[in-house]
Amino acid sequence: MKESQNPEKREHHTETSSFPALKILPLIKTPRDLQKLNHRQLDRLAGEIRRFLVQSVAQTGGHLGPNLGVVELTIALHRIFDVSRDVFVFDTGHQTYVHKLLTGRQDFSHLRQRGGLSGYPSRAESDTDVLENSHASASLAWADGIARANRLAGRPGWVVAVIGDGAFTGGMAWEALNNIAAENEGRLLIVLNDNGRSYAPTIGGLAHHLDALRVTPQYEKALKWGKQTLRGSGPVGNLVYSGLHAAKAGLRDMVSPAEGALFDELGITYTGPVDGHDIAALEFSFTRVLASTKPVLIHVITQKGRGYTPAETNISDHFHAIGRIHPETGLPIDPERFEWTQVFADEILHLARRDEKIVALTAAMLQPVGLLPFKKQFPNRVFDVGIAEADAMATAAGLAYGGYHPVFAVYSSFLNRAYDQLLMDVALHHAGVTICEDRSGVTGPDGASHNGMWDIALAATVPGLRLAAPRDEATLRDELGEAVLVDNAPTIVRYPKGSLPDPIPALRREGSMDVLWESPAGSSAGDSTRASQSNAEDGATDTQSRGSGAEAAPRLLIAATGAFAKLGMDVGESLAGDFNVKVIDPRWLLPVASDLVRASAGYDWVVTLEDGLVDGGFGSQIRNRLAESNVFTPVLSYGIPKQFLSHATRGEILEELGLTSEALVDSIRSRTGVLSVQKA
């Protein structure tokens, strides 16, 4: 970014080495307390907030960069608007830490942890929080709806939508903007928080237009002179500086009359660009809005990671989202481990080198989903569509029609946004599109909107779709390789967030399934067989595995999927004294394989373990297939109930849901009526 594109550089850096005591921030109990401060004190408050954020988020992890960039903006909003009457709608919501601090929530010691503050807006925390979903581009539609409701009910007050330039690329934002312009009345303010980035630099035609608005040399030169010369020359100079802001719109039109034309043509009054780190300038712009009776868009220029050198100099994402770090250096505290995303990144690049027809798509998340290495080696074969998952899916269908095999890498919870396109654009047209679904299952600290728990149930409704759930590095590589060979239907490869487990080798392959563990034929209670000590013959059938000592024991088949493979093996071992157990990994969950249906017929019970919804999920699909095939083996399904999960660690959530080895063993014994031999 050119120097002229940045807000004016002032002394704003956070002193992380000593963390001096906070003097003003602890006095802010409600936004009304901000009215007691002059602008010099407000600037000091902004510095204290940045120090607090760096020190606090360094201990818990969270969205640091976005919040460092909106400190002055949030202060100014709370100074001019009244949250007891006006409504703030924060798009995505990851930039609301400052809002929380100013509305009485200053205990960040357990941020994003069980019992602590959410990392996103939360109505349970405060009436000032409205939009909780944390999925981008929805704020303008929400704001439009609230403004319409206010008019119908005769309620006063403004609706303020704060949306980033990245989220502004989403189709929902433009659909809402079209409706707002058509109505063209009401107290509705859109604050376009333009830092040139979402996770990475914002792309597309809108980004180019906003770049043009940022770079107006004459305009920037005039305002910079006013800031440097007038604000430092006492009360008279400040008065003149305010006058300069009063003439700002005219000055802008004189030096660059095309600015804001895109929004003006839509019927939205455009103001800006405004320095998002100048509280006085922001307050002046917001105050002018109060006299309007029609929607207004204020274009605010901010700097992601502002005031914290490690974030400012981190080119990849300016500390968009971090784990625990050393606040003085920004270096991570926890050692890095090889993660699922890195395996995907390595394997898709390997496959692309062998097949030039493989192309990749992302929705503004090139680095988080692991496509950056692909982009570096094959820049013409990666397409970033912005925050527009539905567009990505339909674009993938077009690429498939054109003879390529698109791989769309996306977070599981964001795949929900492209369901219609998956169904009608990809599946209906038998398009060979592979979806690599990162962060599937319970993710934890980011709360209800980020758990990737809906995908299997949704995907099960799509005709022809095939879905795989790898259990470790080797199976991720294998199943991704199998997926890109399918050229007449959509495929999904789902994998969780975080570090890889140790390798989980199979005893053998039976049809399409991997056998992971089984009670050996004729064994005494508690004996077991693992791949590392296996002497089982390849191709052994369920009938062959029965021994004289095991025939009397009830037969239990455990289908443990993906990240729950090791859990299934632990459960199987614990039940080996009471059941003749086999633990399998189905590998491909959808459609349910005929091999699994046939195998189920030879068992007294089938247990399914899945890191997804129980209702409509893998277990439900097995139950349906068995019924269709006149196989009446009972199916006991374990997974995530149909509810929104509060933020906590993944382990805490799984324990609460009873998805631990001990809890599952007790439940299976209870539901089957088979008591433990040791307890008998």
Model-derived segments and their meaning:
Residues R324-E336, G444-D446, R466, G619-A680:
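Peripheral docking tails and interdomain loops at the edges
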Residues K2-L102, D264-E265, D275-L282, H299:
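N-terminal amphipathic, basic-rich helices that act as targeting or association modules
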Residues D107-L117, A182-N195, A427-R439:
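A glycine-rich helix N-cap at a beta->alpha junction
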Residues P257, F284-T287, D317-H320, E339-R354, ...:
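Glycine-/acidic-rich phosphate or pyrophosphate-binding loops and their flanking alpha/beta elements
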Residues V87, T302-K304, Y308-L415, Q421-A431, ...:
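Non-catalytic terminal/interface segments that mediate subunit docking, oligomerization
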Residues E15-F19, G196-F344:
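Long, well-ordered, tryptophan-enriched scaffold segments
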Residues G237-A311, G432-E437, I456-A506, S661-A680:
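Structural signature of the thiamine diphosphate
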Residues H63-E183, K357-I358, T362-A363, L371-L372:
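Cofactor-binding active-site loop characterized by glycine-rich and histidine/acidic residues
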